Regions:
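N-terminal signal-anchor/first transmembrane alpha helix
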Residues: 2-32, 38-45, 50-53, 57-65, ...
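Intrinsically disordered, low-complexity, charge-biased terminal/linker regions in eukaryotic proteins
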Residues: 28, 35, 80-95, 99
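Transmembrane-helix bundle segments that line or gate the permeation/cavity pathway
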Residues: 48, 69-87, 117
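A structural signal for multi-pass alpha-helical bundles of membrane permease subunits
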Residues: 70-78, 161-481
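Short, membrane-exposed interhelical loops at transmembrane-helix boundaries
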Residues: 88-105, 371, 436, 440
Length: 481
């Protein structure tokens, strides 16, 4: 007890975080280390690294130049997103009508967001420069010689080569992911739509009005709340069935093909893989034509008497001479799920085949000796093993299906027309996912403000589902390890 108590009292100190390390280095640094926070090159000059001083001074100077000539002018207008509309004015000097010096709201928003990121990057970089100079200071205090520029380059080509490799990808993530994400979030709090399109018109901040509109608080005439509930419900239903029908369908197909009683397993496996070889968009466009009101499949059903039978039992309206596979909500939802099974099951079959082949043979043999039948072995051994291995894959498949644009859009675009006026007023359809509704709002109706809100909601749905699922998966990950 005494030893354990003493060990607890003498635990190793925690590694300081980034801010704590910067604070320590700045306080204990010499004058050059402190000055490097404000002028990056001064610290390196004082510590004998002239080439590095030139490089960091150039980077800092370029960033400050951008802020001075592009950042600050736009940040000054960030609160209003511009006040001067584009119009023609008479120029006395040329005696002609010319375009005035107008404000572009989107340019102001874009440059402001980039400026915020540049400012944050400058502060973080300045803190790292201070820590770097403090390390140089400590080396010089011990009488050792600091690295020259060539030696520093060699370090980043050897010991710290990971930094060199990650530099471009990180810049790509910032430019193509972080900046657009911030702009998306910002647009959700503006009135950016077809009536406020730059450069001819200005848009401005509207606070949480767009979110109130989405959740039914936009007044008596607003239908976005109703449409959002309908579309979100179908999105989750679709994602559930699209994920698990493919999952279990692929498992069953893999088990049947790999069964010892199955003849020519390689032939059947190759046959089902044909759907993978054909590009998905080609398959979807062809199938859309097959299942159209006047398509081949409807002709076959009508000639076989299936259409008449479905009319007699009430599944097809009496006034129709076809089965509305892609033109009525219920039929369209069912058809889309069935077509997705045809497209997705072969992928899952290949994955399940690999996993089933890796189930320990002694586990199956022990179950067989204990008298387990095939059904019991499936539910007690094979399915739990598959779930333990493919749990993370199922989560990503669900998120992928929430955002499965191709299947829904290519099967229904130009074919399905909603009869629901409330949905039509919100530019939505019964078969829309959140992502296809978002796409239609931007491309067809230029309603960027509501599309941005929907984008945020899609992220929230996917993030919450992923966090919850991985929380439970991590609890059970050691079951079959």
């Amino acid at each position: 007890m005494a030893k354990s108590a003493a060990a607890a009292l003498h635990t190793e100190p925690k590694e300081p975080n980034f801010l704590q390390k910067f604070g320590h280095d700045f306080v204990h640094g010499d004058i050059f280390t402190k000055l490097s926070f404000f002028v990056w090159g001064l610290g390196y000059i004082g510590h004998g690294q002239l080439m590095k001083a030139l490089l960091v001074t150039f980077v800092q100077g370029f960033a400050l130049y951008f802020l001075a000539f592009f950042g600050v002018p736009n940040l000054a207008k960030f609160g209003t997103l511009g006040t001067v509309k584009m119009e023609m004015v008479f120029d006395v000097a040329t005696m002609k009508n010319v375009v005035n010096d107008y404000d572009n709201s989107f340019e102001i928003l874009l440059m402001s967001m980039i400026s915020f990121i540049v400012i944050a990057a400058l502060i973080a970089a300045a803190m790292m420069v201070v820590s770097s100079n403090y390390q140089l200071q400590k080396i010089r205090e011990t009488g050792k010689k600091t690295n020259n520029f060539v030696q520093d380059i060699n370090v980043y080509l050897n010991e710290k080569f990971y930094v060199t490799l990650l530099t471009l990808p990180v810049l790509g993530v910032v430019v193509f992911t972080i900046v657009p994400l911030f702009i998306l979030i910002a647009v959700a709090f503006t009135n950016y739509d077809q009536q406020h399109m730059p450069p001819n018109e200005l848009f401005t901040w509207v606070g949480l009005n767009n979110f109130f509109t989405l959740f039914g608080g936009g007044g008596m005439t607003s239908t976005f709340g109703y449409s959002f509930a309908k579309v979100l419900t179908w999105t989750l239903v679709w994602a559930f069935f699209a994920t698990f029908t493919n999952f279990f369908g692929g498992i069953l197909m893999a088990m049947f093909i790999n069964d010892k009683k199955t003849k020519f397993p390689k032939f059947w496996r190759t046959l089902f893989m044909v759907t993978i070889a054909v590009p998905q968009f080609v398959t979807l466009l062809l199938v859309r034509n097959f299942f159209s009101n006047n398509g081949i499949f409807n002709t076959m059903m009508r000639n076989a008497g299936v259409t008449g039978f479905l009319q007699n039992i009430g599944l097809v309206d009496k006034g129709l001479s076809y089965i509305p596979f892609l033109t009525q909500p219920g039929w369209a939802m069912f058809t889309i799920i069935m077509i997705n099974i045809w497209i997705g099951v072969p992928y899952q079959m290949l994955i399940a085949t690999g996993v089933l082949m890796n189930i320990p043979a002694d586990m199956i043999e022990a179950a067989r000796i204990d008298g387990a039948n095939p059904v019991q072995m499936f539910f007690r051994i094979k399915l739990p093993y598959l779930l333990s291995v493919q749990g993370p894959s199922l989560v990503t498949d669900f998120v992928k299906n929430v955002n499965n644009f191709n299947v829904i859009y290519l099967l229904t675009q130009g074919v399905f027309v909603t009869q629901n006026q409330a949905l039509a007023q919100s530019n939505a359809k019964e078969v829309d996912l959140l992502v296809t509704w978002l796409f239609r709002l931007t491309q067809d109706y230029y309603n960027y403000k509501m599309a941005a809100v929907l984008g945020i909601m899609v992220f929230i749905v996917c993030a919450v589902f992923t966090v919850v699922c991985f929380h439970f998966i991590n609890k059970k990950e050691a079951t079959f390890s």
